[in-house]
Amino acid sequence: MEPAEEPGQISKDNFLEVPNLSDSVCEDEEVKATFKPGFSPQPSRRGSGSSEDMYLDTPTSASRRVSFADSLGFSLVSVKEFDCWELPSVSTDFDLSGDVFHTDEYVLSPLFDLPSSKEKLMEQLQVQKAVLESAEHLPGSSMKGIIRVLNISFEKLVYVRMSLDDWQTHYDILAEYVPNSCDGETDQFSFKISLVPPYQKEGGKVEFCIRYETSAGTFWSNNNGTNYILVCQKKRKEPEPVKPLEEAPSRQIKGCLKVKSRSKEEPLLAPEENKFETLKFTESYIPTIICSHEDKDDLGANHPNVDDINKKHDEHNGKELDLMINQRLITSQDEKNTFATDTVNFTNKAEGSEKKQAYHEINTDLFMGPLSPSLSAESSLKRDFYHSRSSSPGNEYGHPHSEEIISDMGEKGPSLGDTSSDELMQLELCSKEDLDDNANPANGSGRVCSSFDQRMACGLKNNEAGIKKTGIQDYKYSHGDSTKLEESNASSRDDYAKVDNKKEKQTCLGVNENPSKNFQSVFQTQEGHMGYPKISTEGDKANNQDLTSLLSKDITANTWAVTVDPCPSTNAKRSWREVGSGSNLEPGTSDLSSPRNFSPLTDDHLFQADRENSDSSNPENQNMNTRHRKKWNVLETQSETSETESDIAKHTKEQAEYKDMWEKTDNSRNLKATPTEHLFTCRETECYGLSSLADHGITEKAQAVTAYIIKTTLESTPESASARGKAIIAKLPQETAGNDRPIEVKETAFDPHEGRKDDSHYSLCHGDTAGVIHDNDFERESHLDICNLRVDEMKKEKTTSTCFPQKTYDKEKHGIGSVTSIDEPSQVITGNQKATSKLDLHLGVLPTDRAIFQANADLELLQELSRRTDFNAVPSAFNSDTASASRDSSQVYRHCSKKSVPSYGEEKAVTNTTLQSIPTKSEYNWHPESEVLGHAMSKPEDVFKSSEIMKSGSGGERGGGPILQQKEGSLENSQGPMFFTNEPLENLDEASSENEGLMHSGQSQCYLGDKGLVSSASATVSTQELEAQGRESLLSISTNSKIPYFLLFLIFLATVYYYDLMIGLAFYLFSLYWLYWEGGRQRESVKKK
């Protein structure tokens, strides 16, 4: 035992040694607490007591002070500013691979041999009792070995004794038993030897032997007395094999732009026919650029003057290459279009030969691949235009003109492919002026516009000379081809090519024609190159080929052919404008297109006719083109329509013929609809286009027509004694427009089928202010009560007043007068709808559109809102039998009259008619006994006369009917068709015993004469029926009044849950008081009425 030492005296030698256990009792306790067996861990408990003791040991000083900077007059916060350039710029891109230092890796190499077979292994086992069976070298300086021992006894231990310094010191490693390795005779144990960095060096040697301890004795295995030796060696990295660089072929090195090689035996000069075939324009064509020194050498050998030609066209070829790249970009975008591109056909032999020659000259420098066909034609035509302008006047106004436009497009590079609508493609052509005589206003050449709409207008304005010479012939071609287009899309492409060939021949050969005639072929040639949908604008007839080819609709070439577009196309704006702006060369023939949306609520034919006249005979009116923008928001679909208006002096004779045809087609029928049918509703309104008559010297004043439109709907069955109805009044604006002031028309459409349970749908068009008639009279007398409710009255009636401010776009160009903005509210009366309610006034208001059109003009656009019916059927339509089942069914009479302009160009009035209303039974127990059928007639004079509605007395006249008198004009002067729609509404579930008390509607008589239209109706209501209606109305009102209280109670509960009880109770009491006060006001207003 070593002598005892003091606890504080620890020498340098025994610094890392374990202290002597016999030094003192205190040290003994500390050692026992510090050194504990690893197999008996005891959890250390961190109680609160130890932490408290630790904090209690910390001395506290009561004399410490805390002072703040603000008490000393300093600021609490000190800010130090650093300049950004003083900060060192530290890059965030850390290359960890370069920073990591590479350490040398060492491995253990064995210097012993293992048993090669199991027999040798068993022989050694019988002698040595333990043998190293296998050794596995792990990554790094580690080795894992397997020891096979002879199963002598059950209890056994295997050690591996190793030494690093030739057995001066050694370590024993306990080997672990390998599970499930016992085969009855032998067992397996595993061990692992690893070298750490102090001993990990080159040439380090590890020696080990095996000691096998059993109950029978201890056995050693040392590799026959030589021990098992492992040598530490540095791991050698095998160099990565460097792949040899493959030499590229000399041809590939010389020609960097070379894509494919071409044999030298290929003839350098192809025949002219083959070269002309390369001009064919295909969708999937990709130009190939091949340029190599070998090919240039061959080319120079065959053509000694190649260098001279290259020097001559060096600058030109650079420009052509830029144009080709831009053209390729545009072509790749245009390949997405659904229209196939046709072959470019040249009609002039001399021109074709010049193109071939120019094509050969272009390809002399880049000969090994053809240029883009569109580029070849474009460049040749452009060069012909520059060099041969004086010698070829036909080409001057023909193809070079169009190619200049395409060249401008190629240089500016606009995005022209795959847009949602073709009319929105704004070609950047306005900024650059054409190179022909466009600057000369005397020639009247067409100006380049920024959109298809303006281009069509420009092509049609300056078209007078072309109309006189070849207009009718071109019309025949285009009209015939457009008819073929409607049948098949495949045949349409061929027809386009035919039309192009014929028209290009006429254009190129017609030298003396107006340049505007040839200006239109620009768009045809351009569309042929660029893959646009073909639009025939030759002559003065514009066919809607784009819309028909896209929608596959049939256009009948009769007087008023209509293309219905239930699913609006994106090309509608351009197509409708192109069609409508054409002049009608053949009387009685016109192709019309209607891009506007119609309500798909009817399964019968829809009718809408749009006509416009365009005449460019007077150069003063060429600047009178006004673009009117209208937004049609029907069923959340908007379509923009740009319009141009011009004078109508040339077409008054044709309109007179249209007048006769309208008189012939005015035969109509009275329609009776079943409850399952849908009432036709016009979801859009049409404006009356008025064009200028300034060139005729006629100064006329126009006054807007004021008309009342009343619609009522009754529904009843033979077994139900109740009826419910709807009354709608629309008042048209009354404005006075001067000679230079456009007339402003506001159009409002109502959607009343929100909340309706039946299949009836109504729409009210052409109204600035729409109100609902409320007749609260309980007397039996029959009287008229046509009124426009004020806003405060509607609030008392629990109604909603909706104001749609309208915005007028001021068109102050070319001398057109300004238009002031008029905001007129569209009032919609909304009533409560119940299962037993008699009045259904739940109306949805569609956005109100406003169209500005030119005053002093002809009425050209006519809208028909329903089916054409017979004028003679009016009395029978309004005479209802009291014994018939449909006596309470509503009869809606709508009429739009049109007066065609005679040859002297006078303005005629266009008016809207009113609707007849039949007695209804309301939720509030008031009955409009009879209502007015009003009709505003057209007048063959200069001033629009507003029709007057004569009202009978409120209570003085019993059984008296309303009389509508017209100042002037007669019904015969109106050329528009009449419309009658008759529809019974859904049945109400009431007892059939109430049939006896049913109010009997008298026969409504309509007198059609030259002076006016008279409608009268009378009915009687029994006192018992009124009382029954009152009880039912009170019951429904009381039911409705309980709903807000219940909702307020729920709000009260939620308030109490989230907030205080007193706050929720106060809110609830206040709400109850407010509801009671509002209910009292409503009762008082009802009593006053």
Swiss-Prot record:
Pfam families assigned to the protein according to its UniProt record, in alphabetical order: CBM_21
Residue ranges constituting the CBM21 domain according to the UniProt record: 123-231
GO molecular function terms listed in the Swiss-Prot or TrEMBL record: protein serine/threonine phosphatase activity
Subcellular location: Membrane
Keywords: Carbohydrate metabolism, Glycogen metabolism, Membrane, Phosphoprotein, Transmembrane, Transmembrane helix
CDD domains per UniProt: PBD_PPP1R3A
Tissue expression per record: Skeletal muscle and heart.
Annotated region (Disordered), positions in chain: 32-57, 385-420, 479-501, 566-649, 949-968
Feature: compositional bias, Gly residues: 953-962
Membrane-crossing residue ranges in chain numbering: 1047-1067
Role: Seems to act as a glycogen-targeting subunit for PP1. PP1 is essential for cell division, and participates in the regulation of glycogen metabolism, muscle contractility and protein synthesis. Plays an important role in glycogen synthesis but is not essential for insulin activation of glycogen synthase.
Name the record gives this protein: Protein phosphatase 1 regulatory subunit 3A
Organism per entry: Mus musculus (Mouse)
Organism lineage: Eukaryota, Metazoa, Chordata, Craniata, Vertebrata
